[in-house]
Amino acid sequence: MEKKELSACVPFMGFSGKRLDQILSKLFMQYSRSCLKKWIIMNNVYINGKIENQPDKKILGGEKITIYSTDEKLPINLPQNIALNTIYEDSNILIINKPPGLVVHPGAGNQDGTILNALLYRYTNISSIPRCGIIHRLDKDTSGLMVIAKTIFSYNKLVTLLKKRKIIRKYQGIIKGNMISGGIVNYPIMRHPFKRICMTTDSLGKKSITHYKIINRFKFHTHVSFRLETGRTHQIRVHMLHIGYPLLGDPLYGGIDYGCNYFQENRNIYRKFNLFRQALHADYIEFIHPFTQKVMSWSASLPQDMKDILLYLKK
């Protein structure tokens, strides 16, 4: 049987110091973790041309990983015909506008029905690209723009841009509280020691920087623009809670509603607009195109739920 080859260079950002099996699950998300671990044990995984069969091998970053396999029966993430809202597409990249509720890639609680499954259906060769071309992710209930690489060349270029903080990503959100001025939150973020699905600010965490400025103020809320300098999991949500202005509707980091009038206003919004997600939208992305080397940018207007809430708050 002809061997199938998969290869990728390990990025430094977010990968250095992690176990081999963890690295593979991030680079080759189209395959299940059990499948990847089996390939390691079966001597099908090479690091810089040498066999590595220890799943707990620590990876430094920068290594070339190659997988050879003839076992086509191992479980993989299946292609699924899921519609994607395409903003821009050429032979190198894809820009999509993700709706709230759509998961980026399979994981605990969401085994399918994800953007990754949609990409596998839409592009038959994308499984050979690490992470199926997914450069960055958005939380399940955060809407907005994402960039997908359609070639290994584009993937490596875009990952490098992301590492060097050359991809500009902006968001809009509605926060609870009347913010006085914009500013910068520069505080490390790490996994919460007890609530494993949550992140938290901690001096032992990874460097995390969020820029924010006010778009409009209301009686009990503020419409805010954010720019990410780093891209940690739940970064904007955690940083806003840290400074006392949690995102409206956030089920994990929403904070406590204080004051009778304040509580009543939030309850009215939740009921009237059926808001069960954080009011956060990735509305702008800009980077140098990996092939043409031209600066390109895209914008996506707010989803209807956030538009309706802002109209309500203006009254």
From Swiss-Prot:
Which catalytic reaction applies to this protein? Answer: uridine(1911/1915/1917) in 23S rRNA = pseudouridine(1911/1915/1917) in 23S rRNA
Q: Which residues are in the S4 RNA-binding domain? A: 18-87
Which CDD domains has this protein been placed in? Answer: PseudoU_synth_RluA_like, S4
Top-level taxon in the UniProt lineage = Bacteria
Q: Could you name the Gene Ontology cellular component terms for this entry?
A: cytoplasm
Record keywords, A-Z:
Cytoplasm, Isomerase, RNA-binding, rRNA processing
> Gene3D superfamilies from the entry?
Pseudouridine synthase (3.30.2350.10), RNA-binding S4 domain (3.10.290.10)
Task: Quote the protein name from its UniProt record.
Answer: Ribosomal large subunit pseudouridine synthase D
Source organism of this protein record: Buchnera aphidicola subsp. Schizaphis graminum (strain Sg)
Organism taxonomic ancestry: Bacteria, Pseudomonadati, Pseudomonadota, Gammaproteobacteria, Enterobacterales
Gene name, Swiss-Prot/TrEMBL: rluD
